[in-house]
Swiss-Prot record:
It is found in: Nucleus. This is Copper-binding regulatory protein cuf2. Zn(2+) binds at C11, C14, C23, H25. Its main location: nucleus. Pfam families: Copper-fist (PF00649). InterPro entries: Copper_Homeo_Regul, Cu_fist_DNA-bd_dom, Cu_fist_DNA-bd_dom_sf.
């Protein structure tokens, strides 16, 4: 095995023939030899294990997930300005949040009236965005005034649509441990 920058490398032929530990071929294309056993779940636990030189079980996934402080504060400020949004977010469950974050393409924003507001595919990053006039044209005016307490105005629908678009632009779960 050839050691470069503290990592073990071997050629493809030797790795396929299960001779990676005795490979001395420097003229062939080299591939990093992975360590044996199950990989650790996160880089933090891997670094701790290398420092302590002992077996360590990763417990990072057991720690509760807290939303980012700035984004959470922005959400609170926005919902205080729009009480309708506050009621929508109070009744969402962890399962709903998890489903919408895992598969945003299949989700449409559903409100108390049972109507759905179409997702702009610009949120998902691959098509021209819906304009607010398009969204308001898709809302049936007869549904807006069915119930006084439950109905939204077009401006409130547009606010909710913009907020949903804002939330999806903030979605970046790559940094979650």
């Amino acid at each position: 095995m050839i050691i470069i920058d503290g990592k073990n490398y071997a050629c493809v032929v030797c790795l396929r023939g299960h001779r990676g530990s005795s490979c001395q071929h420097q003229e062939r294309a080299l591939i990093e030899v992975r360590t044996r056993g199950r990989p650790l779940l996160c880089k933090k636990c891997r670094a701790i294990k290398q420092q302590l030189k002992s077996n360590l079980k990763c417990v990072c996934h057991l720690q509760p997930f807290l939303p980012f402080a700035n984004e959470y504060q922005e959400l609170l400020n926005f919902t205080q300005k729009n009480p309708i949004l506050a009621s929508l977010f109070l009744f969402s469950t962890d399962k709903d949040i998890m489903n919408s974050s895992l598969n945003p393409a299949s989700q449409a924003y559903t409100f108390d009236l049972g109507r759905t507001l179409p997702i702009s595919e610009d949120i998902l990053g691959y098509r021209k965005p819906l304009s607010l006039t398009d969204a308001s044209n898709r809302i049936d005016a007869s549904q807006l005034n069915e119930k006084e307490n439950d109905s939204f105005t077009i401006n409130q629908e547009a606010d909710i649509f913009n907020f949903a678009k804002y939330l999806h632009s903030k979605d970046d779960i790559s940094g979650i441990p």
